[in-house]
Amino acid sequence: MYQKILVPVDGSAPSTRGLLEAIKLARDDHAQLRLVHVVNTIVSAIDYAAGPGSTIDPSTRTNDADVAALKRAESLVTQNGLNSEPVLLSTVTDNVGELIVRQAKEWNADIIVMGTHGRGGLSRLILGSNAEHVLRHTQVPVLFVRGQPGN
């Protein structure tokens, strides 16, 4: 049924639950998996303190935790006997959800499988909702996998 499954990953428990569901789908359908981790490289106060002559390029800032999250996801796929294509994206200005939508369109994904924290109310308002953005702006079917209660 699905040939190309896009899976946003961030290293969180809900993200891992989404990945495990995507692995099941991929195994059943012999589908390709693309793992996408988006780094939002907001310029920190330290970067501003470096001054106007600074050579710091915030668009290239990733850290070991970002790379490790993607590698852990890739390892989980491999442990389940499948292959995946990891993609690390970086943004300063774009909404993380928008990059996921764009990636799904560019890759011609058949479905996006996404773990969600299931936050609502004030929490969602403060934290934003990548899941909601993806749902509202993609033309691709989306499967949300909720985290465990309390996560």
Regions found by a protein language model. Give the residues of each.
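Small/aliphatic-rich secondary-structure junction motif
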Residues: 3-55, 76-85
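Short, well-ordered secondary-structure micro-motifs
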Residues: 18, 45-48, 97-99, 124-126
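Short, hinge-like loop/turn segments at secondary-structure boundaries
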Residues: 50-54, 103-105, 130-131
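A short acidic, glycine-rich active-site loop
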Residues: 53-68
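Structural beta-alpha unit
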Residues: 75-112, 150-151
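Glycine-rich, Arg-bearing micro-motifs that act as flexible, cationic patches
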Residues: 111-133, 151
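Short, flexible loop segments at boundaries between secondary-structure elements
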Residues: 142-151
